């Protein structure tokens, strides 16, 4: 009986930890700073673009 209660509590704690980590990852999205990995320019901060060759946030070219 004690073992099953312990396993149940441990399972609930793990479920809470995983769901909390997933929520933090979704809500704590920052914009990509200079030389951060990116998939598109929306991932980068203002005045930076995602390099199509290297997939890093770089300064936008004035040309």
Curated annotation (Swiss-Prot):
GO cellular component, one term: extracellular region
Subcellular location(s) per record: Secreted
Signal peptide: 1-21
Keyword annotations from UniProtKB, A to Z: Disulfide bond, Ion channel impairing toxin, Knottin, Neurotoxin, Potassium channel impairing toxin, Secreted, Signal, Toxin, Voltage-gated potassium channel impairing toxin, Voltage-gated sodium channel impairing toxin
UniProt-recorded Gene Ontology molecular function terms: ion channel inhibitor activity; potassium channel regulator activity; sodium channel regulator activity; toxin activity
Disulfide feature: 31-45, 38-50, 44-57
Residue ranges the record assigns to the propeptide: 22-29
Keyword Secreted: yes
InterPro entries reported for this sequence: Huwentoxin-1 (IPR011696), Huwentoxin_CS1 (IPR013140)
Tissue: Expressed by the venom gland.
Family assignment from sequence similarity: Belongs to the neurotoxin 10 (Hwtx-1) family. 63 (VsTx1) subfamily.
Job of this protein: Inhibits sodium channels Nav1.7/SCN9A and potassium channels Kv11.1/KCNH2. Also binds the voltage-sensor domain of the potassium channel KvAP (from the archaeon Aeropyrum pernix) with very slow apparent binding kinetics and affects channel gating. Reaches its target by dynamically partitioning into anionic or zwitterionic headgroup lipid membranes. May bind to the open state of KvAP.
Recorded domain comment: The presence of a 'disulfide through disulfide knot' structurally defines this protein as a knottin.
Something else known: Negative results: does not inhibit potassium channels Kv1.1/KCNA1 (IC(50)>200 uM), Kv1.4/KCNA4 (IC(50)>200 uM), Kv11.2/KCNH6 (IC(50)=45 uM) and Kv11.3/KCNH7 (IC(50)=55 uM) and sodium channels Nav1.1/SCN1A, Nav1.2/SCN2A, Nav1.3/SCN3A, Nav1.4/SCN4A, Nav1.5/SCN5A, Nav1.6/SCN8A.
Record-given protein name: Kappa-theraphotoxin-Gr3a
Source organism per UniProt: Grammostola rosea
